[in-house]
Curated annotation (Swiss-Prot):
The lineage of its organism: Eukaryota, Viridiplantae, Streptophyta, Embryophyta, Tracheophyta. It is found in: Nucleus. The keyword Nucleus applies. GO terms for cellular component: nucleus; transcription repressor complex. Disruption phenotype: Maintain higher tissue sulfate concentrations under sulfur-limiting conditions. Transmembrane segments: none annotated. Belongs to the MS5 protein family. Involved in the utilization of stored sulfate under sulfur-deficient conditions. The keyword Acetylation does not apply. GO terms for biological process: cellular response to sulfur starvation; regulation of glucosinolate biosynthetic process; regulation of sulfur utilization. Residues 72-139, 238-260 form a coiled coil. It comes from the Eukaryota. Keywords: Coiled coil, Nucleus, Repeat, TPR repeat. This is Protein SULFUR DEFICIENCY-INDUCED 1.
Amino acid sequence: MERSLKKTKNNYNNSIKSNLMKDDELFHVIHKVPCGDTPYVRAKHAQLIEKNPEMAIVWFWKAINTGDRVDSALKDMAVVMKQLDRSEEAIEAIKSFRPRCSKNSQDSLDNVLIDLYKKCGRMEEQVELLKRKLRQIYQGEAFNGKPTKTARSHGKKFQVTVQQEISRLLGNLGWAYMQQAKYLSAEAVYRKAQMVEPDANKSCNLAMCLIKQGRFEEGRLVLDDVLEYRVLGADDCRTRQRAEELLSELESSLPRMRDAEMEDVLGNILDDDFVLGLEEMTSTSFKSKRLPIFEQISSFRNTLVC
């Protein structure tokens, strides 16, 4: 009888422990916090549970210095720093500590850097990084010769194709040129991006390039494609609202005819390096040893600047 009671008690205790373990696992799954008590785990707990970004950065630094999941710690710390308007510090951290990170993490760090450069208005560095990433894709380096790669957003994994990545990078490059008032370069990039994977947001940006150059009718045609649902993403409310605002801006600008001086403004000066690379890559014929998937995108090589 006593043995039976002891066995029942042990089973009860084991059941409680099992339930506690399940609850603990469920907690980490729900809050997307890793298990354990390492510096990186403490950093994620401070970031996601305690909502204390300053403390999270302290623990991220400890994780980096002790070699605890350095890839994730550096990237996550940079994201938190950006949220705290410490983007310049985040840029220097990535540049200083990325040599400690694995080769597979470099692409993710580049993407964080692109956002940080944009946040800080460091357009020249953003443009150079975007061009380098586009060259890597064309040369077959970025995807390890595969047609897709796995990306992560908000804790969820998804597949990204070569074409989607090219379109995304070209979109970012076009926007960077826009901030530099290099509207012809931006136009060329957006047109190539639309050839790879058309979407309504890039159509709006292309229309803005044309409006800035006084090419109102061309801009109207591009906006019509959005407002008539002829491009992907045209049903998005914010995109449609932006297209309508651009159309209003266009119509208000129509009475002001473009004069000869407009040809000399900074916005109509094409990036010389961009043109040179465009012409050289268009005129150059060569045989490639790359995988077929990269041969399929060879028609887009003139988006890259040598």
